[in-house]
Swiss-Prot record:
The chain crosses the membrane at residues 26-46, 79-99, 215-235, 264-284. It comes from Bos taurus (Bovine). The modification Phosphoserine is found at S366. This is Gap junction gamma-2 protein. PROSITE patterns: CONNEXINS_1 (PS00407), CONNEXINS_2 (PS00408). Residues 112-123 have a biased composition (Basic residues).
Length: 429
């Protein structure tokens, strides 16, 4: 036992810290400190001379060996070493399964991520800008119409692409949380998920059933070894032992070295075994109560979380006249009656100004514009054809005749055309 190395078993048990609860970490501490260290350090020095110092009051050859075998069928130290190995076996098997499961899950996540990346749709190309207006056309005046919404903003992004990006980020976060070995605290997760307890992490990794199974196996082994230790050694080491086995000629008395020290050490190992069994039971109760609380919380209705602010309803544009259509990706904007009257008055004032300019230049023989009011027109010449009575409030008549004698501004403002302002396309009617 002096040359026995515990480094491999110790390193293996330390890996269990990464995938166990807080109570499981306490159990592992008790196992390493009070069992492995005590057995390796204290047991070797106490039981090193247990057979050499075991003497009997006879000189019969072989009687000492036969009586020692009857006193201790299995050495205390070897019994405790075997107990440590057997009780640690379920935890080691659980660790192997957990490592295999997590490695396989990470590989599956990488495959799914690689399949999702080529299937993403390319981002939409920007809409082509409309052609620039004619150099001679002025920019249309701001008549108060609402701007059409033609561009696709961030909120209109393809939901499939956004969903794929979100899944990739979630997979990367999950892989990073699983790859964090010794730290069971999930960074950035408030509440019970970010606490020191690793129960939620075991649930997230899908290892709860295997973890409970290894707890049950450990508890069963603890009970079995406690019963076996009592049947083999009892609760004390007697200072002498009466032996009547062959080849002893008669009943001989054999004496044990350091019986009190060995009795204390035996009782300490009893206490450690009972403590480990109690920790196993507490851990099973902790997992059961935690799962029950999660089930109760899951049945309760969740409080309404403050969501995003509701969007205001879109402003309804004036209805377009029946029979009018617009190309795709264009919005049809119709002027209101107030805007029409204001523009007609502006056209009338422009026509009156043009007539005054012609009179100043001496061109009095030309008939006035049909869009002028009645009081602004001169007396008609005899024999001249009667001009049509154009209404100043008729947008179509003024717009139709404004192309003949009025400036290009009137035609561009009244006629049906398209212009570009701030990169957005608007159809004016």
């Amino acid at each position: 036992m002096t040359n026995m190395s515990w480094s491999f078993l110790t390193r293996l048990l330390e890996e269990i810290h990464n995938h166990s609860t807080f109570v499981g970490k306490v159990w592992l501490t008790v196992l390493v400190v009070f069992r492995i260290v005590l057995t390796a350090v204290g047991g070797e020095s106490i039981y090193s001379d247990e057979q050499t110092k075991f003497t009997c009051n006879t000189r019969q050859p072989g009687c000492d060996n036969v009586c020692y075998d009857a006193f201790a069928p299995l050495s205390h130290v070897r019994f405790w070493v075997f107990q440590i190995v057997v009780i640690s076996t379920p935890s080691v098997m659980y660790l192997g399964y957990a490592v295999h499961r997590l490695a396989r899950a990470s590989q599956d996540e990488r495959r799914r991520a690689s399949r999702r990346r080529p299937s993403r749709r390319a981002p939409r190309p920007p809409l082509p800008l409309p052609p620039p207006p004619h150099p001679g056309w002025p920019e249309p005046a701001d008549l108060g119409e609402e701007e059409p919404m033609l561009g696709l903003g961030e909120e209109d992004e393809d939901p499939g692409v956004a969903e794929g990006l979100g899944e990739d980020e979630e997979a990367e976060d999950t892989g990073a949380a699983k790859g964090a070995g010794g730290d069971t605290k999930v960074a950035g997760v408030p509440g019970p998920a970010g606490q020191h307890d690793g129960r939620r992490r075991i649930q997230r990794e899908g290892l709860m059933r295997v973890y409970v199974a290894q707890l049950v196996a450990r508890a069963a082994f603890e009970v079995a070894f406690l019963v076996g230790q009592y049947l083999l050694y009892g609760f004390e080491v007697r200072p002498f032992f009466a032996c009547s086995r062959q080849p002893c000629p008669h009943v001989v008395d054999c004496f044990v070295s350091r019986p009190t020290e060995k009795t204390v050490f035996l009782l300490v190992m009893y206490v450690v075994s009972c403590l480990c069994l109690l920790l196993n039971l507490c851990e099973m109760a902790h997992l059961g109560l935690g799962n029950a609380q999660d089930a109760v919380r899951g049945r309760r209705p969740l409080p309404a979380s403050p969501g995003p602010m509701p969007r205001p309803p879109p402003c309804a544009l004036p209805a377009a006249p029946s029979g009018l259509a617009c190309p795709p990706d264009y919005s049809l904007v119709v002027r209101t009656a107030e805007h029409a009257r204001a523009q007609d008055q502006e056209l009338a004032s422009l026509a009156l100004q043009a007539l005054q300019d012609r009179r100043a230049l001496g061109d009095l023989d030309s008939p006035p514009g049909p869009g002028l009011p009645a009081n602004a027109r001169g007396p008609p010449k005899p024999g001249a054809p009667a001009s049509g009575s154009g209404s100043a409030t008729s947008g179509g008549t003024v717009g139709g005749q404004g192309r003949q004698g009025i400036k290009p501004r009137m035609g561009s403002e009244k006629g049906s055309g398209s212009s570009s302002r701030e990169g957005k396309t608007t159809v004016w009617i």
